[in-house]
């Protein structure tokens, strides 16, 4: 978990880890390999998947179609595992609630072959109870699939679900 106030650099770090931005100096290593040398497109496709605060779903598709874009084999089962019903799986994503859309985004990230999931404020648009449920779901499902999940949040409650917390505060990073 990466925890800190707005503007503390949490999302910048996630952008660097995801290959969405390049460092001005130094390098980012994954399993000892510089991600810039892997080819960023290949890195983003094979090594990391994303869960964004705004869900980043294809709006004219159903949840099933959104997940099939990542892995044609992982459809209904994955969507059921994140708590969606058969009816919800086949609806247009715009007809789903924010919590349901976030579950679709999580299912899509979990379906990716990538071993790392980067989640930027994945519960920022959700009420407290739904945020707790979605965080637990993401962390538990990622663990069961042997994936590493890195969640950026400003919420102590969300961060409590993590094994390790990096706290960004006043230009310093502490590990808890």
List the model feature ranges, each with a label.
Residues 18:
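Helix-to-loop junction immediately C-terminal to a conserved catalytic motif
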Residues 35-49:
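ABC ATPase NBD coupling module
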Residues 117-120:
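Catalytic Walker B motif of ABC-type/P-loop ATPase nucleotide-binding domains
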Residues 92-96, 100-102:
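Conserved ABC ATPase signature
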Residues 26-34:
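Conserved ABC transporter NBD signature motif
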Residues 78, 82-94:
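Conserved ABC nucleotide-binding domain
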Residues 106:
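Hydrophobic anchor residue at the start of the ABC signature
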